[in-house]
């Protein structure tokens, strides 16, 4: 029972890693609310992706923070900042104050971001590690889907009520303090002799380039998923396909598909191997094209479910690939670099959508552009894999 609760508590750290986009169902009402104050929709959309910029800043400071502070203190501080930054706009909805609170939310998520993933590799090895990484990806998606669904229900009260979802951070904090030990004993026993016997080998430029390519891949997948999360509620309401609550339901189902992919993750890795990377973006592109051509809520939902399935699969595969190919001495650095790519993709979502707006006539055309880029990348990866 103790081991089970330890696993649950470790997985719970991932429940709110992408919670910054959970309030997306409230975007249409937020645009109306701040529009009355003369604030454009672009600036309102920025509030949703804004925490990602703070996350990037924290990740850049991660090596220094890890040397100065203990892992436990960093995680506890992160969960406290996450909860406070998420809750604050309930008290005051002034744009500038909400802007600051979203940055605080990002600081909190950034502090636990890399550790929620690397801690799995510290506590587990072999097939159990692969299984836990798959479950971690599912936990991340489950948290996002659950929070997005709850936000949609709270939207019937007011858009600011959706921020109540960040109270989950306090529950996760309690689980972590109660059930997660400070340092696995087996890691202590292994690391001490290594430090005496040999100095850590530097990260080669070739290996660094490999890590950066994985970071770009993961960032691209997350850019598309984040853009979908921002754009689906707008498309549903503007085109009269449904209500904001129905858009919230689609987003929740889209994210829940990630749980299904996480469940089959280890089996899919065994079947497709390295070809899984190209397959993910090819299917992602197909789903985006379905969303672009959709003239009903049902068809839009089918495309969203397709993208939701492969999104989590692609990101989880990148982290698994890193844990398999990168030495443990450099694992935290590699994880941090990939997370930088992931959060850069998420942070740029609203900016990229704004860029697309300069040469497109409608919000749904972003799906077509992303779809074409995804299929192009998938073909390049497939050809590279086939002829290398």
Where in the sequence are the language-model features?
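Helix-loop-helix hairpin linking two adjacent transmembrane segments in secondary transporters
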Residues: 135-181
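Intracellular juxtamembrane helix-capping segments at the cytosolic ends
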Residues: 111-124, 313-327
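Extracytoplasmic gate region of multi-pass secondary transporters
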Residues: 210-252
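Cytoplasmic helix-loop-helix junction between adjacent transmembrane helices
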Residues: 95, 101-139
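Paired small-residue
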Residues: 85, 96-104, 298-306
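A late C-terminal transmembrane helix in Major Facilitator Superfamily
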Residues: 323-360
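Conserved MFS/SLC helix-loop-helix module at the cytosolic interface between two early adjacent transmembrane helices
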Residues: 57-94
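Helix-to-loop junctions at the C-terminal end of transmembrane segments
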Residues: 58-70, 261-273, 357
């Amino acid at each position: 029972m103790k081991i089970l609760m330890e696993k649950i508590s470790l997985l719970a750290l991932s429940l709110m890693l992408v919670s910054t986009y959970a309030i997306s169902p409230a975007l249409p009402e937020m645009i109306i609310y701040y529009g009355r104050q003369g604030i454009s929709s672009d600036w309102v959309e920025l509030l949703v992706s804004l925490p990602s910029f703070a996350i990037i800043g924290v990740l850049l400071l991660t090596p220094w923070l890890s040397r100065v502070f203990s892992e436990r203190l960093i995680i506890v501080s992160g969960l406290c900042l996450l909860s406070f930054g998420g809750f604050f706009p309930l008290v005051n909805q002034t744009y500038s104050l909400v802007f600051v609170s979203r940055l605080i939310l990002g600081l909190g998520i950034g502090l636990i971001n890399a550790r929620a993933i690397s801690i799995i590799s510290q506590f587990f090895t072999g097939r159990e590690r692969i299984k836990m990484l798959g479950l971690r990806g599912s936990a991340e998606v489950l948290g996002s889907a659950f929070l997005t669904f709850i936000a949609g229900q709270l939207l019937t009260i007011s858009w600011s009520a959706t921020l109540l979802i960040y109270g989950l951070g306090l529950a996760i904090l309690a689980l972590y303090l109660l059930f997660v030990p400070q340092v696995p004993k087996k890691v202590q026993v292994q690391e001490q002799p290594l430090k005496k016997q040999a100095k850590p080998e530097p990260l080669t430029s070739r290996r660094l380039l490999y890590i950066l390519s994985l970071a770009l891949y993961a960032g691209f997948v997350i850019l598309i998923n984040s853009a979908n999360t921002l754009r689906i509620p707008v498309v549903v309401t503007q085109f009269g396909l449904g209500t904001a609550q129905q858009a919230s339901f689609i987003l929740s189902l889209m994210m829940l598909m990630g749980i299904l992919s996480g469940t089959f993750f280890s089996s899919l890795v065994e079947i497709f191997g390295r070809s899984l990377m190209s397959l993910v973006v090819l299917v992602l592109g197909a789903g985006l094209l379905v969303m672009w051509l959709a003239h009903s809520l049902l068809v839009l939902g089918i495309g969203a479910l397709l993208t939701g399935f492969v999104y989590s699969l692609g990101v989880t595969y990148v982290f698994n690939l890193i844990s398999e190919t990168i030495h443990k001495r450099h694992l935290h650095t590699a994880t941090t670099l990939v997370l930088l790519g992931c959060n850069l993709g998420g942070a740029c979502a609203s900016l990229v959508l704004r860029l697309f707006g300069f040469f497109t006539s409608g919000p749904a055309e972003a799906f077509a552009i992303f779809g074409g880029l995804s299929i192009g990348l998938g073909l390049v990866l497939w050809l590279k894999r086939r002829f290398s």
